[in-house]
Amino acid sequence: MYDYIRGVLTYISSSTMVIESQGLGFSIFAPERWLIELSSQLHRELIVYTYTVVRETEHVLYGFHTRGERECFRMLISFSGVGPKTGLAILNTFSLSQLCSIARAEDIKAIASVPGIGKKTAEKLMVDLKQKLADLLPLDAQILASWEPAKPSCMEEGIQALAALGYPKSSAERMIAEAMSELPDHASVAEILPIALKKNLQGLNKI
């Protein structure tokens, strides 16, 4: 299985891209909204994180902008009734941050808004998402921690990241402060965010 493919983007359609690498053209299915973003990147080199689905007659590649998105896709298609097509539709509708927020809020209506997902499937999917929330949060923190703004303090950057996930500022400040109290002074945002999210989830489970 490929972890990623580095190559030149030579073609884009509404559902696929072609990456040329070492003389081979890889046809890769990807979320439509990422493909739209890539429309200005034709003939440029990029890295695509891939997941391979093996069928009887073919191997199908699915591609994502980050490892976190790829792992989220892997998680989604492990759920009953969710195949690759539906998994892509979910990631095309929601970012990983939004999925985390939806799972916390148990927003079944939001899940049911994804093309191809009815109310009953949405209800089942919500149960699965809630059970896997602890796995989703570190993936989302990994993506958020890759931001590189104009070097605010770790606390400020952590608070901004949690605010982007939908946490109120007061909650974000408390979560970051608690996480930082357990880590060395030189801890990075990439280390702080997973601890903050994990501790908050543990607190919710005690309620």
Curated annotation (Swiss-Prot):
InterPro entries: DNA_helicase_Holl-junc_RuvA_I (IPR013849), Hlx-hairpin-Hlx_DNA-bd_motif (IPR003583), NA-bd_OB-fold (IPR012340), RuvA (IPR000085), RuvA_2-like (IPR010994), RuvA_C (IPR011114), RuvA_C_sf (IPR036267). It comes from the Bacteria. GO terms for molecular function: ATP binding; four-way junction DNA binding; four-way junction helicase activity. GO terms for biological process: DNA recombination; DNA repair. The keyword Transport does not apply. Residues 1-65 are annotated as: Domain I. Residues 66-144 are annotated as: Domain II. The keyword DNA-binding applies. Residues 155-207 are annotated as: Domain III. Keywords: Cytoplasm, DNA damage, DNA recombination, DNA repair, DNA-binding. It is found in: Cytoplasm. GO terms for cellular component: cytoplasm; Holliday junction helicase complex; Holliday junction resolvase complex. Residues 145-155 are annotated as: Flexible linker. Pfam families: HHH_5, RuvA_N. Transmembrane segments: none annotated. Its main location: cytoplasm. Homotetramer. Forms an RuvA(8)-RuvB(12)-Holliday junction (HJ) complex. HJ DNA is sandwiched between 2 RuvA tetramers; dsDNA enters through RuvA and exits via RuvB. An RuvB hexamer assembles on each DNA strand where it exits the tetramer. Each RuvB hexamer is contacted by two RuvA subunits (via domain III) on 2 adjacent RuvB subunits; this complex drives branch migration. In the full resolvosome a probable DNA-RuvA(4)-RuvB(12)-RuvC(2) complex forms which resolves the HJ. NCBIfam families: ruvA. The RuvA-RuvB-RuvC complex processes Holliday junction (HJ) DNA during genetic recombination and DNA repair, while the RuvA-RuvB complex plays an important role in the rescue of blocked DNA replication forks via replication fork reversal (RFR). RuvA specifically binds to HJ cruciform DNA, conferring on it an open structure. The RuvB hexamer acts as an ATP-dependent pump, pulling dsDNA into and through the RuvAB complex. HJ branch migration allows RuvC to scan DNA until it finds its consensus sequence, where it cleaves and resolves the cruciform DNA. Has three domains with a flexible linker between the domains II and III and assumes an 'L' shape. Domain III is highly mobile and contacts RuvB. Belongs to the RuvA family. This is Holliday junction branch migration complex subunit RuvA. It comes from Chlamydia abortus (strain DSM 27085 / S26/3) (Chlamydophila abortus). The lineage of its organism: Bacteria, Pseudomonadati, Chlamydiota, Chlamydiia, Chlamydiales.
